[in-house]
Amino acid sequence: MADNSIYSTLELPAAPRVQDDSRWKVKAVLHRPCVSYLVMVALGLLTVILMSLLLYQRTLCCGSKGFMCSQCSRCPNLWMRNGSHCYYFSMEKRDWNSSLKFCADKGSHLLTFPDNQGVNLFQEYVGEDFYWIGLRDIDGWRWEDGPALSLSILSNSVVQKCGTIHRCGLHASSCEVALQWICEKVLP
């Protein structure tokens, strides 16, 4: 019987060669300094940005004095700054004399408007609440720092000898009434 076998030559691809890892190690070593360099550049930029922000903040705080300013004048905690003045709006209520003493103890005084400027701004801010201010009736309405009141004040009783500010303007009140108050401090 004849042998019907078919033979074929099988050509298999050669086994993959193991690549030399040393080439990859060299590239990895070369990339490490680049990463370190990028980190250094990023940290340097961050430092420059932060220093610029500090300089900008100091310039805002000290005005045109820049670094000549030995210490920026700041308002105490819980006080609001407007220009060269700090203002404290109390949350608690006291009579006029206790409010006056509170402000004096903080190196300030009850809010005054000796030149009648700023009344409208504060009227808008205080809204419906009444706040003690540095105004009282002793032989006529006078501000605590001396000048006579040249604005009108609403009063409905002769016993109302202390001034308040309200959304609707200046009002007289009995000095014994417990109200909130506004202290004012001029920055050096």
From Swiss-Prot:
A single GO cellular-component term from the record reads: plasma membrane
Matches recorded under Gene3D superfamilies: Mannose-Binding Protein A, subunit A
Expression by tissue: Expressed in lung mast cells.
Pfam families from the xrefs?
Lectin_C
Please give the SUPFAM superfamilies that the UniProt record associates with this protein. Answer: C-type lectin-like
Q: Which residues form the C-type lectin domain?
A: 82-184
List membrane-spanning regions: 35-55
InterPro entries cross-referenced by the UniProt entry: C-type_lectin-like, C-type_lectin-like/link_sf, CTDL_fold, KLRG1, NKR-like_CTLD
Q: How does it sit in the membrane?
A: Single-pass type II membrane protein
User: An example of a Gene Ontology BP annotation on this entry?
Assistant: innate immune response
Q: How is it modified after translation?
A: Phosphorylated in response to monoclonal antibody G63 binding and antigenic stimulation.
Q: List the disulfide bonds.
A: C75-C86, C103-C183, C162-C175
**The protein's role, per its UniProt record:** Plays an inhibitory role on natural killer (NK) cells and T-cell functions upon binding to their non-MHC ligands. May mediate missing self recognition by binding to a highly conserved site on classical cadherins, enabling it to monitor expression of E-cadherin/CDH1, N-cadherin/CDH2 and R-cadherin/CDH4 on target cells.
How would you summarize the oligomeric state and partners of this protein? Forms a monomer and homodimer; disulfide-linked. Interacts (via ITIM motif) with PTPN11 and INPP5D.
Record's protein name: Killer cell lectin-like receptor subfamily G member 1
